[in-house]
Amino acid sequence: DIKNPISTVTNTKPITKTTEHVFFKLSSYQEFLKKWMDDNDIQKEIKNKLSEWLSGGLVDWDITRDKPYFGFEIPGLKDKFFYVWLDAPIGYIASHKNYCDKNNQNYLDDWTEGSKTELYHFIGKDIAYFHGLFWPAMLEGSGFRKPNGVYCHGFLTIDGEKMSKSRGTFFNARTYLNHLQPDYLRYYFSSRLTNKIEDIDLNFDDFMARVNSDLVGKIINIGSRCAKFINKDFDNQLSAEIGNNELLESVLSKKSEIIDNYEARNYAANMRVISSLSLSLIHI
């Protein structure tokens, strides 16, 4: 035990208080969550982790916090706020409604039970239980449809180290965008991203090599060379016929593999397939 605890923020001693809280009856959704995980697309590693919660029996979830607290104050309850992970996922529905309102669509077409829309969440591995237990139970209890799948990724490290502002090992998106195109980074992440729960390391030497060698040197090079020939010799007009059916068939033969890789969320495998195709085209 700490003999003389003092808050480093307020310089005062903590005291014991009695308070009332509101709970979400998560325990009532035990069987529903088991079935939902079995019927939908959840990675094996994440499913095993979530099953540990279920095997011990779910307990009801405290969804309130006392003032001072950030977030939404609960109407009718004095100095009580919703716990941030209760209201945060609801932002998915709110942001989608905002999009639909701007495009003359009804957001409920996508969020009601029986909707044909496929709904997937892509999240970090540290918030799997919020999206794999609490959120589906909330949706079930409120009559909304549930996600078709939840895909978890690992963390992003910088040159082999965890992100830390104090140590300077962090990545500022705005600074990056002030100097380089976002597609370079999208390609780099795609070339490293599999369907496993693995961290991705952003190494800038590797980033530069992959972008220059694979993206620019192979894939973009094809478009650049073709554009010059089409402009110079063919008045910017494409042929109405395929002059090399064997080449076309070799490219189309990879169609199913590419589709399967995307369905499996194995983006790195697809980048290798596409890079291999581009290399074969360069050497024609």
Where is each model-derived feature located?
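Cys/His-rich Zn2+-binding cysteine-cluster or related metal-binding knuckle/ribbon modules and their
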Residues: 1
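Acidic, turn-prone loop/beta-hairpin segments
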Residues: 205, 235-259
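Long, non-coiled-coil amphipathic alpha-helical linker/lever segments
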Residues: 255-269
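Conserved small/polar residues in nucleotide/adenosyl-binding loops
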Residues: 282-284
